[in-house]
Design a protein with these regions (language model features):
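N-terminal accessory/interface modules of nucleic-acid-binding and processing proteins
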Residues: 1-323
Length: 323
């Protein structure tokens, strides 16, 4: 299958769900407790569009195992793919050989290739999971997640009734913890805003206006939604849709109709954001010198109750209940 077809198929799957499902009860493939899919042979986790593709397949088929591999990889592990099973396509990028006259300062040339992978539930005699199993969904993920958020150095202020990242002040604003129904609701909202935070010019410099024009806001929100899902899945935290998610996702349908590759682009940017946040956590765990702008949490603030949504005020409205 051409790689363009894979992008289009994934977009069509999500678009069909958006247009035919009950918006109030629709569960996107990136919501739930599924861990990040990993390759059974190498142990490496999949990235970008492949995560969404494999989550979609797992949701449709009811796969609970996060391990995937090609036919040959399963065979090398002593497992046999059953004849009746159908593969799921993923993309990988292969480096091409350089010409003798190539400029060594240029980036290495890559070409996209498709691979057929099967879930562990589709094979006979799969090996047992690795010694380090996927993290279980924590009943109270806040202590570990708070440490993760602190490691980013983001300025986080609590108070008011809005969840947003403000580029002008480079701060994240959240409602009080007591306003959220569950700890995972709080963690999901904070993860969403942290992904927005990574897009600042002095971080990942994520500017989607050239790529999406007037739909850049919807694309950025999709990046934050997917990035939050990746961050939480890596930490074994269940992702649950908030009550307003149907209205919140309404802008995605026009985006996907106009550009079938928008979902893939957003997934790639979301992976970069999640990796950026994880790298900051790893650096903090290595006890590197603290960066300027250490993490600050204010218990109560006078937030901008009179502010309206402007280009400098990116609002997610990800809270689950506000009192």
């Amino acid at each position: 299958m051409p790689t363009n077809d894979l992008h289009a198929r994934l977009a069509a799957t999500i678009l069909t769900q958006l247009e035919t499902a009950d918006p109030a009860s629709w569960t996107p493939p990136w919501h739930g407790a599924d861990p990040m899919p990993r390759n059974a042979r190498t142990g490496r986790r999949y990235r970008g569009i492949n995560v969404l593709t494999l989550w979609c397949a797992a949701q449709a088929q009811g796969y609970a195992d996060a391990r995937w591999a090609t036919y040959r990889q399963w065979a090398a592990l002593g497992a046999q793919v059953r004849r009746v099973e159908r593969a799921t396509l993923v993309l990988f990028y292969k480096e091409l050989p350089r010409g003798t006259d190539a400029d060594p300062t240029d980036g290495a040339p890559f070409v996209a290739r498709a691979a057929h992978v099967f879930n562990a539930a589709q094979v006979d005699a799969p090996p047992p999971p690795a010694d380090a199993p996927a993290p279980s969904v924590a009943s109270d993920p806040l202590p570990a997640f708070d440490a993760f958020a602190a490691s980013t150095g983001a300025a986080i202020q609590h108070g008011g009734n809005r969840a947003c990242y403000v580029p002008a002040t480079d701060t994240i604003h959240l409602p009080p913890r007591s306003a959220f129904r569950t700890p995972t609701g709080y963690a999901g909202t904070l993860a969403h805003e942290l992904v927005h935070w990574t897009g600042a010019p002095h971080r990942l410099a994520r500017d989607l206006t050239r790529r999406f024009g007037a739909r850049a806001y919807a694309a950025e929100e999709l990046v934050a939604e997917l990035g939050a899902a990746f961050v939480l899945a890596d930490r074994g935290i269940a992702r649950a849709p908030h009550p307003d998610h149907a209205a919140y996702c309404a802008s995605w349908a026009p985006l996907l109709r106009a550009d079938p590759r928008a979902l893939s682009t957003a997934a790639t940017q979301a992976s970069r954001a999640a990796d950026y946040l994880t790298t900051m956590q790893e650096a903090a765990e290595c006890r590197l010198p603290p960066r300027a702008g250490a993490h600050r949490v204010t218990a109560s603030i006078e937030t901008a109750k009179s502010r309206t949504a402007t280009p400098d005020y990116i609002t997610a409205n990800r809270y689950q209940r506000l009192s």
